[in-house]
């Protein structure tokens, strides 16, 4: 994985453009997400553990919003010899190019179809595992339920969805507390007040977090009857839903 340091927002910018997963971001993404998302490494490792437990032979796995391929690699390490196929999708050409380099660095008997495209257009079928790792929050809110419905329909009985997201809270004091804890996490990882402020402005219009209640209601309404929050650190969470 690329280990270049994230300094994208280190200098003052008069105009802050909306955040996008362009070549600049792709080049520092590993560092950016490690320093910005508490528990990211644990989430990635546990996705691999879920794959070991739930992926059935001759089925498909979908990594929707695969970025540099961290989840795909974690899954692939755990499912050797099962004759499965991973479909890894991202709409950023820069991310896909770097993801391909990361995949090529490891030998595996599990095929990966790396697709540069919109996850909303992907046909999901014969799936034992679908991963949405900090991806749903970037879709327009009105498109999220349709995607969850498509995932549910494409999962085999007993298959799972792992959904990781930044979350918000209806309780205002809790929202403020955990948001401040997250900012302290970023400060402790070397981000300046300028970097934090400018990135927040860049994300404001493109990332719209939901509450845990909204996530659970959406999953339940589309048919998932088994749901649990399995990880939370501050305002970041990962959930698992079983069909």
UniProtKB/Swiss-Prot annotation:
- E.C. numbers: 2.1.3.-
Q: Name one GO molecular function term.
A: S-adenosyl-L-methionine binding
Q: Which residues bind S-adenosyl-L-methionine?
A: 40, 65-67, 90-91, 118-119, 133, 200
Name of the top EC class for this enzyme: transferase
- Biological process, per Gene Ontology: tRNA wobble uridine modification
Query: What residue stretch is flagged as signal peptide?
Result: none
Superkingdom of the source species: Bacteria
Describe the reaction catalysed, as an equation.
prephenate + S-adenosyl-L-methionine = carboxy-S-adenosyl-L-methionine + 3-phenylpyruvate + H2O
In terms of InterPro entries, this protein maps to: CmoA (IPR005271), Methyltransf_25 (IPR041698), SAM-dependent_MTases_sf (IPR029063)
For this UniProt record, the keywords arranged alphabetically read as follows: S-adenosyl-L-methionine, Transferase
The protein's matches in HAMAP family, at most eight in alphabetical order, are given as:
Cx_SAM_synthase
**Cited function:** Catalyzes the conversion of S-adenosyl-L-methionine (SAM) to carboxy-S-adenosyl-L-methionine (Cx-SAM).
Return the similarity comment. Belongs to the class I-like SAM-binding methyltransferase superfamily. Cx-SAM synthase family.
Query: What is annotated about its quaternary structure and interactions?
Result: Homodimer.
Stated name of the protein: Carboxy-S-adenosyl-L-methionine synthase
Q: Which gene encodes it?
A: cmoA
